[in-house]
Amino acid sequence: MVFSSFPTYPDHSSNWQQQHQPITTTVGFTGNNINQQFLPHHPLPPQQQQTPPQLHHNNGNGGVAVPGGPGGLIRPGSMAERARLANIPLPETALKCPRCDSTNTKFCYFNNYSLTQPRHFCKACRRYWTRGGALRSVPVGGGCRRNKRTKNSSGGGGGSTSSGNSKSQDSATSNDQYHHRAMANNQMGPPSSSSSLSSLLSSYNAGLIPGHDHNSNNNNILGLGSSLPPLKLMPPLDFTDNFTLQYGAVSAPSYHIGGGSSGGAAALLNGFDQWRFPATNQLPLGGLDPFDQQHQMEQQNPGYGLVTGSGQYRPKNIFHNLISSSSSASSAMVTATASQLASVKMEDSNNQLNLSRQLFGDEQQLWNIHGAAAASTAAATSSWSEVSNNFSSSSTSNI
């Protein structure tokens, strides 16, 4: 772009007379010259430049101060700014409150983003009102609510403390009532640790818990006398009266007292150590009669008899009727077995030992026979002695 130079004139009154002459300016655009002539007819006086009002930024809330605004604060983009741009006059700042007639009021905002509903606040009664709207009867303001909340919180704190104390007292009372109820019903609460469990068992075995004479109940059910020592670490059997086994005329619970072949379960019952019977594998094989050991045990303990299984004893008075009813069949079986074994000659010592062990195991499971079966028992005993003599003679001859 090529611009022609403008003639410069000193600031003198004679320069205004030369304004009547035309001024020729040449403006060239890429080699093209365009001549424009400006022919002003009358000189125009210099116009004063209108300066906009200075805007002072507010450091507190980012608003700007505008002359004539309510309080001098208008936020950019707010409803007041929109009202100013729309040339709507802002409401008066000091209006009378419709309730208390106080002039200590201020304009807050336009309600519902509508320029026709300006909202005001009265600092005296702390209430809001909107022009053209209903008056609010509920006081709205931070000061009153803060004071009320502070008073309520202080009073509420005392109330919460008293309520907490009452709750703790109620819980303590309920715990005491539960404890007394448990003691009245002879029930103990769940143990909290192993020490409390051990103390409970010790007090139970010692008979410290009232209403539970479990030793006498156990002795009565098992057919034991009151002279026998109490059964330690044994659960009470008075709760199992309705659980019985029906064998004809016999109606009694079946409790196996003692251990198996190793006798491990009998060690838990301290009161039955003297009635334990030796295991099957500990019996000698030659020259001994198992019925002699049975008679010796019965003489020491007349209230007990041998029960099916190794090392198990049980009261004879419970199963007396059962033995009496099956005495004839047992005697016939013993006689037939003895007669058959008497006619057999063994050639191998291993077979003799196995047969004798089987015989001992079968005959050991027989119970004591009373009444009319005494004669058959004597015959079986004599047959057993003959069989044992034949075994010893045949074994010596084979050796």
Swiss-Prot record:
Induction context: By cytokinin in procambium.
What are the boundaries of the region Disordered? 139-176
Q: What is its main location?
A: nucleus
The record's statement on gene disruption is:
Narrow and down-wardly curled leaves. The pear1 pear2 tmo6 triple mutant variably displays reduced radial growth. The pear1 pear2 dof6 tmo6 quadruple mutant plants showed a greater uniform reduction in radial growth, associated with compromised symplastic trafficking.
GO biological process terms on file: plasmodesmata-mediated intercellular transport; polarity specification of adaxial/abaxial axis; regulation of DNA-templated transcription; root radial pattern formation
Superkingdom assignment: Eukaryota
The record, for InterPro entries, names: Dof (IPR045174), Znf_Dof (IPR003851)
Keywords on this record?
Activator, DNA-binding, Metal-binding, Nucleus, Transcription, Transcription regulation, Zinc, Zinc-finger
Recall the GO molecular function terms of this protein's record.
DNA binding; DNA-binding transcription factor activity; zinc ion binding
Q: What does this protein do?
A: Transcription factor that binds specifically to a 5'-AA[AG]G-3' consensus core sequence. Binds to 5'-TAAAGT-3' motif in REV promoter to triggers its transcription, thus regulating adaxial-abaxial polarity and influencing leaf axial patterning in an auxin transport- and response-dependent manner (e.g. IAA6 and IAA19 genes expression). Probably involved in early processes for vascular development. The PEAR proteins (e.g. DOF2.4, DOF5.1, DOF3.2, DOF1.1, DOF5.6 and DOF5.3) activate gene expression that promotes radial growth of protophloem sieve elements.
Could you identify this protein by its name?
A: Dof zinc finger protein DOF5.1
Naturally occurring in which organism (per UniProt)? Arabidopsis thaliana
The uppermost taxa in this organism's lineage are: Eukaryota, Viridiplantae, Streptophyta, Embryophyta, Tracheophyta
Gene responsible for this protein: DOF5.1
